[in-house]
């Protein structure tokens, strides 16, 4: 698979551009998963996928949640799917819900073995993706000429089964499988045959690595070409006998296939592999879900796709089971016919070329037997030809054969060109002409060139039962009503309608009305025209959503009923969907869906028309006036055309338009005297070219995002201003702190110098004090000497006294600087201590200042970063603002009004036409002109019809609201043919033409009041 490309939300097909958008789903990937696991699933293709954020499954065991982006918003078209471990393997419906409603269903497969997703590049042998046995690969043919290759290992004598799944995925892929051995030789090959996908069963002689190549049959590819390949050792069931069973009742079923554990040889082969058989007990569940995926040609057949044999989906028909018997063995077929006892059920196959099977039975004159062959409807490739013959014998016992029917007889195709409901399977209701023997011959249409064991069929011969089946075609109406319905689902706009085709299969002589009802329609939704008239095989059901209906997606169950009392029959309504309109060599294809959903979208229906009546009973030769009311929305005010369909032949149908600015009109129908009697459904469509705005809410949301972006930009700009101011403030603070630090450092230098000077001065003072102390000591010595001289030994007393006095003075003088120095020393010591403290304080201040500068520098850097971040945020906000502005422009461009051809259906009118009692002719004088205040006598002549012999009353019938002319009443007696009416124009009325005037005759006929008309021309003149 090459790189996966997600689709843009808006995808349009050529037919869709002319109509209002409605979601359709054409591809999901992968289209299946293993139970008990979760997997990523992507919507790969579809139309009108806007805001698609819901996947809806037909079983509660399958759930999905939208993948989210980084902002927590759902990612369109991407989901996480969880598969409950208790869910049964098989096929399930999945739908997508978005802005434009709910989509058609696509198939999702649940299996039991591990799964992987194909990885590219794997187009050549050297690029083969390696897988293990018992694995399912989800792959896709991505483009033209895409070939996917896979490698896996097998053991000696091991048998493997390679199953492709594409038809069961609603895929356009038609897989071709090619298996190569370890030497590069192709050892097996298979391709899709009709409804059967390719299968390879291979037994390896040696342990080796095998290579599988997968491609489309015409090498096509794209998002609508998914496939699944299972490479495993599980059994391969090719067919079963019987293929018709009763639900809920255990039955021994003989399975035929390959790689069947415990299987017995049959002597036959399929694709060169031995065909084995084995008896197993089977109980078919009664759940409607089990019929999902059945071809629409079998939609009237009760079927079940059984998943009780791992790896296989086996299709059964459900019904009362007649005594079953297999066809004769090849040895037994040497006798001319196989005798069966009625009622009978026989399973057989066209095992070889020119294989013809003959079944003979005895019957009584007047008996009625339904001969029904099942092959195509159960997925077989056989195309049976049916021949019913009466067997007679002459007197000598020689047999002769009279043909009573051939294969084309009794085929029903109510879906016509819309839903493929025509089957190849023949059916014939035999009314036995005489007592005796009869025989049925069966052979394949192409028996001269083909035959195979799996070209199987089942034939039943049973008493016909008066019954019916209803199939609803869940689809999208065409834009113009001319093309057949397209793939779609019931998605209503508020105040709008939706039409759905419904088909009836009748059997056993059933010919009554069939009513369709629902017990669980959501609030605001109404179902109209829910009756298929007696003898009809189809109708159009109309659903209406009220203007105030809520947006929703709801599962709805419909029931069909017919008859009354003990004869009442209730049947579930089968839902069918269109898979392909015809592509890649595949025809227009439909299948059975397991559920019906009704959705109401956010959009409004621009126009809606409503007839003034929903039913009417008329006679041949009668006028019917239908008032029509128009509701305009979304500002639309131009002309609306009204067209009709469904009416029987020989009815004058009006061409009606509702003019600009008007909201009503009256439509005139005239049922001619040769119109067919019986019920019919009158469908009314309003068409107009409407200027349509696609998703205007997207503009509102875009504007809201733009406003938020603008506010975000303002906030970001303010953040920049604040961040810049903070950065500047912090930078200034750094300068201030740096200057302060410089001052502190200068002060520290000064204080340190002062401290040094003081210390030097102190040192000098200390030295001076020491000198003074020495001098004082010397003087004190001298004084002591002088004192000694004062002793008696000293004769020179006066001289001694003098010396003493001088020494004392010297000591005193010497002591004085010592005291001064001591005081100074104390002062210097204090000064030094103060200087040390100042130095320590400045040092601390400097340390703190440096720390403050560092911290402030960090603040500066932080502020710079904040400013840079704010500036970056501004740039992001500017980009967001620009992106939001661009989104607004894109949203406005997308929502710009574009002219769309809107076609909407009204609530249908059920009309019953009865035989007319007669025909009247009217002679109006003056061409119908009557002057104001004057009168005119009108002669009325009656011609009786259909054995009518009663009296009739006559009157002038005017449209509602018209009263300018009045009339007398008259009566034509039972034995009469003429009467006269007097018409009078009011004197004070307006002049002008009177349209849709008739003379109406009314009488009792066939148990009802029957009216019939004669149109007249009337004009009031001055």
Q: Model segments located where?
A:
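Acidic, Ser/Thr/Pro-rich low-complexity intrinsically disordered segments
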Residues: 19-66, 72-76, 85, 89, ...
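Extracellular/luminal low-complexity segments enriched in Ser/Thr/Pro
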Residues: 79-87, 284-297, 502-505, 528-532, ...
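Short proline/glycine- and polar residue-rich coil/turn motifs
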Residues: 69-75, 86, 192-196, 204, ...
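Predominantly extracellular/luminal regions of secreted and cell-surface proteins
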Residues: 106-133, 308-343, 465-470
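Bacterial N-terminal signal peptides
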Residues: 5-14
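Short beta-strand segments of immunoglobulin-like
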Residues: 28-34, 240-246, 476, 487-492, ...
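Extended amphipathic alpha-helical heptad-repeat regions
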Residues: 695-901
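Short glycine/proline/serine/threonine-rich loop/turn segments at secondary-structure transition edges
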Residues: 86-93, 221-224, 289-302, 449-453, ...
């Amino acid at each position: 698979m090459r790189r996966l490309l997600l689709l843009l939300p808006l995808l349009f097909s050529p037919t869709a551009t002319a109509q209002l958008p409605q979601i359709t789903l054409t591809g999901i990937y992968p289209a299946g998963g293993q139970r008990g696991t979760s997997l990523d699933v992507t919507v790969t293709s579809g139309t009108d996928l806007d805001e698609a954020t819901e996947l809806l499954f037909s079983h509660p065991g399958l759930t999905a949640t939208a993948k989210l982006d980084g902002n927590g918003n759902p990612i369109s078209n991407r989901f996480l799917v969880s598969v409950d471990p208790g869910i049964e393997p098989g096929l399930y419906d999945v739908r997508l819900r978005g802005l434009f409603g709910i989509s058609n269903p696509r198939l999702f497969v649940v299996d039991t073995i591990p799964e992987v997703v194909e990885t590219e590049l794997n187009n050549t042998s050297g690029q083969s993706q390696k897988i293990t046995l018992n694995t399912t690969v989800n792959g896709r043919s991505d483009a033209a000429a895409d070939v996917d290759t896979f490698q896996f290992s097998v053991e000696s004598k091991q048998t493997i089964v390679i199953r492709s799944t594409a038809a069961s995925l609603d895929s356009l892929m038609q897989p071709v499988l090619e298996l190569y051995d370890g030497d590069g030789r192709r050892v097996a090959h298979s391709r899709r045959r009709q409804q059967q996908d390719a299968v390879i069963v291979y037994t390896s002689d040696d342990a080796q690595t095998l290579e599988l190549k997968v491609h489309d049959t015409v090498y096509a590819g794209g998002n609508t070409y998914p496939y699944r390949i299972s490479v495993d050792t599980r059994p391969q069931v090719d067919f079963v006998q019987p293929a018709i069973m009763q639900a809920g009742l255990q039955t021994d079923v003989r399975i035929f296939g390959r790689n069947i554990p415990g299987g017995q040889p049959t002597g036959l082969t399929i694709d060169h592999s031995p065909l084995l058989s084995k008896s197993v007990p089977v109980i078919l569940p009664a759940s409607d879900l089990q019929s999902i995926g059945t071809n629409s040609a079998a939609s009237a057949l009760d079927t079940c796709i059984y998943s009780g044999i791992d790896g296989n989906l086996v299709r059964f028909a459900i019904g009362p089971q007649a005594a079953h018997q297999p066809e004769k063995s090849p040895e037994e077929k040497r006798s001319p016919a196989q005798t069966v006892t009625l009622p009978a059920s026989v399973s057989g196959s066209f095992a070889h070329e020119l294989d013809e099977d003959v079944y003979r039975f005895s019957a009584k004159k007047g008996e009625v037997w339904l001969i029904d062959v099942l092959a195509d409807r159960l997925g077989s490739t056989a195309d049976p030809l049916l021949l019913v013959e009466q067997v007679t014998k002459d007197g000598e016992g020689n047999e002769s054969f009279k043909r009573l029917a051939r294969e084309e007889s009794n085929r029903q195709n109510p879906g016509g060109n819309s839903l493929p409901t025509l089957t190849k399977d023949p059916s014939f209701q035999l009314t036995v002409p005489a007592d005796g023997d009869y025989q049925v011959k069966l052979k394949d249409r192409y028996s001269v060139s083909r035959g195979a064991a799996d070209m199987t069929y089942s034939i039943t011969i049973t008493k016909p039962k008066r019954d019916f089946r209803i199939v609803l075609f869940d689809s999208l109406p065409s834009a113009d009503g001319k093309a057949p319905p397209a793939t779609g689902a019931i998605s209503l706009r508020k105040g709008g309608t939706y039409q759905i085709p419904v088909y009836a299969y009748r059997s056993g002589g059933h010919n009554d009305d069939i009513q369709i009802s629902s017990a669980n329609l959501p609030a605001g939704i109404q179902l109209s025209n829910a009756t298929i008239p007696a003898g009809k095989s189809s109708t159009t059901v109309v659903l209406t959503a009220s203007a105030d209906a809520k947006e929703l997606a709801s599962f709805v169950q419909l029931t069909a009923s017919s008859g009354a009392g003990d004869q009442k029959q209730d049947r579930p309504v089968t839902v069918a969907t269109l898979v392909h309109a015809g592509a890649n060599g595949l025809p227009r294809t439909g299948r059975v869906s397991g559920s019906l959903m009704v959705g109401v979208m956010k959009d409004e229906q621009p126009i809606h028309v409503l007839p003034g009546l929903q039913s009417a009973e008329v006679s041949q030769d009668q006028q019917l006036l239908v008032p029509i009311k128009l509701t305009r929305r979304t500002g639309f005010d131009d002309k609306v055309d009204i067209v009709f369909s469904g009416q029987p032949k020989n009815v004058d149908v009006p061409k009606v338009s509702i003019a600009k600015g008007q909201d009503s009109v009256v439509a005139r129908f005239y049922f001619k005297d040769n119109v067919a009697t019986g019920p019919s459904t009158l469908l009314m469509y309003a068409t107009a070219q409407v200027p349509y705005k696609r998703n205007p809410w997207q503009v509102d949301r875009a504007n809201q995002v733009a406003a938020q972006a603008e506010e975000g930009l303002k906030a970001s700009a303010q953040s920049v201003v604040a961040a810049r101011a903070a950065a500047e403030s912090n930078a200034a603070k750094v300068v201030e702190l740096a200057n302060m630090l410089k001052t502190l450092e200068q002060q520290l230098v000064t204080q340190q110098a002062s401290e040094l000077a003081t210390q030097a001065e102190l040192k000098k003072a200390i030295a001076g004090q020491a000198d003074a102390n020495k001098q004082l000591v010397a003087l004190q010595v001298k004084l002591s000497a002088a004192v000694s001289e004062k002793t008696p030994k000293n004769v020179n007393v006066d001289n001694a006294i003098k010396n003493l006095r001088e020494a004392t003075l010297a000591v005193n003088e010497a002591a004085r600087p010592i005291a001064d120095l001591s005081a100074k020393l104390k002062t210097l010591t204090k000064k030094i201590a103060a200087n040390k403290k100042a130095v320590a304080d400045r040092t601390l201040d400097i340390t703190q200042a440096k720390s403050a500068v560092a911290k402030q520098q960090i603040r500066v850097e932080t502020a710079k970063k904040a400013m840079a971040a704010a500036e970056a945020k501004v740039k992001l906000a500017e980009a967001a603002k620009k992106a939001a502005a661009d989104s607004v422009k894109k949203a406005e461009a997308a929502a710009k009004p574009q002219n769309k051809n809107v076609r909407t259906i009204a609530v249908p009118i059920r009309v019953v036409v009865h035989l007319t009692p007669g025909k009247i002719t009217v002679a109006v004088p003056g061409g119908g002109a009557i002057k104001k205040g004057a009168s005119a006598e009108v002669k009325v002549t009656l011609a009786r019809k259909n054995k009518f012999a009663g009296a009739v009353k006559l009157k002038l019938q005017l449209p509602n609201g018209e009263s300018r002319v009045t009339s007398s009443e008259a009566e034509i007696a039972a034995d009469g043919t003429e009467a006269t009416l007097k018409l009078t124009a009011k004197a004070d009325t307006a002049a002008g033409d009177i349209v849709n005037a008739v003379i109406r005759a009314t009488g009792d006929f066939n148990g009802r009041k029957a009216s019939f008309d004669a149109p007249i021309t009337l004009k009031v003149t001055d």
